[in-house]
Amino acid sequence: MSIVTPYEDLLRFVLETGTPKSDRTGTGTRSLFGQQMRYDLSAGFPLLTTKKVHFKSVAYELLWFLRGDSNIGWLHEHGVTIWDEWASDTGELGPIYGVQWRSWPAPSGEHIDQISAALDLLRTDPDSRRIIVSAWNVGEIERMALPPCHAFFQFYVADGRLSCQLYQRSADLFLGVPFNIASYALLTHMMAAQAGLSVGEFIWTGGDCHIYDNHVEQVRLQLSREPRPYPKLLLADRDSIFEYTYEDIVVKNYDPHPAIKAPVAV
C-alpha cells in the first residue's frame, strides 16, 4: 500500500534546498517561502508515523483554544506543558489563539465568537467564501506572548465534504508543524461533525517554512525512517463543538516510530 508523505516530502525539500537565514531566536535556519501540503482526511488521520507525536498535547491544546482560554492553568491541570516557555509568572499568555477565536473584540465593545460564526455559516450557507477564522489581530499582537504562527484558516464545502486550509506565517517544520497538522485535522473533523458533513481535505500553506540549524540531525534521522499507515480518528457525538472532552477523541491503530527530542527555539 502506498503511503502519502506530504510532510516528509516538504521536510526533505527544505533540508536539501532551503536558504540559510538568521532568525529572531538567534538559532539560525534553512528556509523556503510559500510551500503547501495536502491531506485527504477521509483516507486516514494525519498523525505522523515517522516519529511519535504526543497526541494528548495536541488534543488538549485544541480543546483549550476552543475554551477561549489565555492561561496555561487548565493545560497544567491535564498535564500539558507545551506553552510554559512563553507564559508569565501567573500563567498568562495574553489574547492569543483561543481568545481571538472565541472573543475577537469588535469596535462596538462587543466580542465576536468566530468559531460559532463559522459553524453557523457551514450549516446555513455552506457555499459561502467567507467561512474564515483569524487569530492575527493586528491591534492586539503586542499584548500576545507570541504572535500567532498559524494565523488564519478557511473552510470550504463541496459534495457534502468539509475541507480546511490553514495559512501558517512561520513554520517550525520539525517541532511545530506536526502538531499543527494534527490539530487542524482534528478541528476539521469536529466542525464537520457539528455541521453534518463528511471530512474532505486539510490543506496546509506555509509562509516561512524553516528547519532550525540545531534540528538538522533529528530531521535526518526522521527522514531515514519508513512511513507507516496513518491511524483512524474516532469522535464521540456531542451537541456542541464546545462540549468535546479529551475522552471523546480516540486515535486507533497509531503505530509510529519512536519520538525524537529537539530543543525549542524561544
Swiss-Prot record:
UniProt-listed Gene3D superfamilies: Thymidylate synthase/dCMP hydroxymethylase domain (3.30.572.10)
Keyword list, A-Z: Antibiotic resistance, Cytoplasm, Methyltransferase, Nucleotide biosynthesis, Transferase
Reaction equation(s) it catalyzes: dUMP + (6R)-5,10-methylene-5,6,7,8-tetrahydrofolate = 7,8-dihydrofolate + dTMP
EC number: 2.1.1.45
Enzyme class: transferase
Entry keyword annotation includes Methyltransferase: yes
Record note on disruption phenotype: Cells lacking this gene display an in vitro growth defect, but deletion of thyA does not affect M.tuberculosis in vivo growth. Moreover, thyA deletion confers PAS resistance.
GO cellular component labels: cytosol
Induction comment from the UniProt entry of this chain: Is expressed under the exponential phase of growth, and down-regulated upon reaching the stationary phase or under both oxidative and nitrosative stress. Expression of thyA is significantly increased within murine macrophages or under acid stress. Is expressed at a higher level than thyX under all of the in vitro and in vivo growth conditions tested.
PROSITE patterns cross-referenced by the UniProt entry: THYMIDYLATE_SYNTHASE
PANTHER family assigned to the protein according to its UniProt record, in alphabetical order: THYMIDYLATE SYNTHASE, THYMIDYLATE SYNTHASE 1
Residue numbers binding dUMP: 24, 129-130, 169-172, 180, 210-212
Gene: thyA
GO molecular function list: thymidylate synthase activity
Regulation of protein activity: Is potently inhibited by 5-fluoro-2'-deoxyuridine 5'-monophosphate (FdUMP), and by the folate-based 1843U89.
Pathway membership, UniProt: Pyrimidine metabolism; dTTP biosynthesis
Entry keyword annotation includes Ion transport: no
Main location (coarse class): cytoplasm
Top-level taxonomy: Bacteria, Bacillati, Actinomycetota, Actinomycetes, Mycobacteriales
Record's function text: Catalyzes the reductive methylation of 2'-deoxyuridine-5'-monophosphate (dUMP) to 2'-deoxythymidine-5'-monophosphate (dTMP) while utilizing 5,10-methylenetetrahydrofolate (mTHF) as the methyl donor and reductant in the reaction, yielding dihydrofolate (DHF) as a by-product. This enzymatic reaction provides an intracellular de novo source of dTMP, an essential precursor for DNA biosynthesis.
Note: Mutations within this gene have been associated with resistance to p-aminosalicylic acid (PAS) in some PAS-resistant M.tuberculosis clinical isolates and spontaneous mutants. It seems that functional ThyA is required for M.tuberculosis to be sensitive to PAS.
This protein's name: Thymidylate synthase ThyA
Description of how the protein assembles with itself and partners: Homodimer.
Disulfide-bond pairs as recorded: none
